[in-house]
Amino acid sequence: MKVTFEELKGAFYRVLRSRNIAEDTADACAEMFARTTESGVYSHGVNRFPRFIQQLDNGDIIPDAKPQRVTSLGAIEQWDAQRAIGNLTAKKMMDRAIELASDHGIGLVALRNANHWMRGGSYGWQAAERGYIGICWTNSIAVMPPWGAKECRIGTNPLIVAIPSTPITMVDMSMSMFSYGMLEVNRLAGRELPVDGGFDDNGQLTKEPGVIEKNRRILPMGYWKGSGLSIVLDMIATLLSNGSSVAEVTQENSDEYGVSQIFIAIEVDKLIDGATRDAKLQRIMDFITTAERADDNVAIRLPGHEFTKLLDDNRRHGITIDDSVWAKIQAL
């Protein structure tokens, strides 16, 4: 089915207000969920909303909590999220990193005691739209086996890097081949994964999303490389925020809350003039996109460039929502 942006935001707002969330908080949160979905990231927008409400109802998320600054060291700050709403807090933290970067050239905010930030790419994009390089990542509950193991002991720990090119170039990737949200998107659509995404119950690589969702044997991105990167991202976020590691979140909490996150902004224009910046970025993009294609019918992609078209299509033709997901939201 298709809905308009206003219908989608209104549905989110209704559910939030029914939980006695303050009007301004409910409006801002509903706006972010709707924008994420409108951008084509259904896995961390509309599809994630029922899970968000479940955690809200369980008390994992404290909607009236206010993040507090703990430590300030010039370009580096440490904050405690107080388990406030994840996407609103993350937006505020990237805004703060940008403010620090405007003063120091670079700004880093380390956040502890946070909740799931939904679409991490929103915060990298937020920085790039203002002319900054945006880098951020989060740890999570243990949902992926480290390389060589069968048992989940590491997080998917998504990493975002956004560049202020035209259009914005952005990598938004979990340390697994696919996020659990994308496994759900493919399962609901009745599709196999385009490449292997995990192991089946016999330890064989599989493209079946439902099998991986069930047994939790998701495949690290780049095999041992994604496993290793997940581990060091967790270590950095834990140390800089003085927050919880994947091990602590998994062993001490009843669900995924109280995670640690990093937000970095770099003001490029303090290092290079605008014309030179644009020319260098354009040369990089042109060099890549003019390569001989492996398949004449498949364009060479630059990361993040597809979002402009996805957003335009959804604004023109309406936002496609899976019927079962929409039914869940209506029932909340």
From Swiss-Prot:
HAMAP family: Diketo_gul_reduc
UniProt-listed InterPro entries: Diketo_gul_Rdtase, Mal/L-sulf/L-lact_DH-like_ah, Mal/L-sulf/L-lact_DH-like_NADP, Mal/L-sulfo/L-lacto_DH-like_sf, Malate/L-lactate_DH-like
GO cellular component, as recorded: cytoplasm
Function: Catalyzes the reduction of 2,3-diketo-L-gulonate in the presence of NADH, to form 3-keto-L-gulonate.
Native source organism of the sequence: Salmonella heidelberg (strain SL476)
Reaction(s) catalysed (UniProt annotation): 3-dehydro-L-gulonate + NAD(+) = 2,3-dioxo-L-gulonate + NADH + H(+); 3-dehydro-L-gulonate + NADP(+) = 2,3-dioxo-L-gulonate + NADPH + H(+)
This protein's encoding gene: dlgD
Disulfide pattern: none
Name assigned to this protein: 2,3-diketo-L-gulonate reductase
Keyword annotations of the record: Cytoplasm, NAD, Oxidoreductase
The keyword Transmembrane is annotated on this UniProt entry: no
Name of one Pfam family that matches: Ldh_2
Subcellular location: Cytoplasm
The keyword Transmembrane is annotated on this UniProt entry: no
Top-level class of the enzyme under EC nomenclature: oxidoreductase
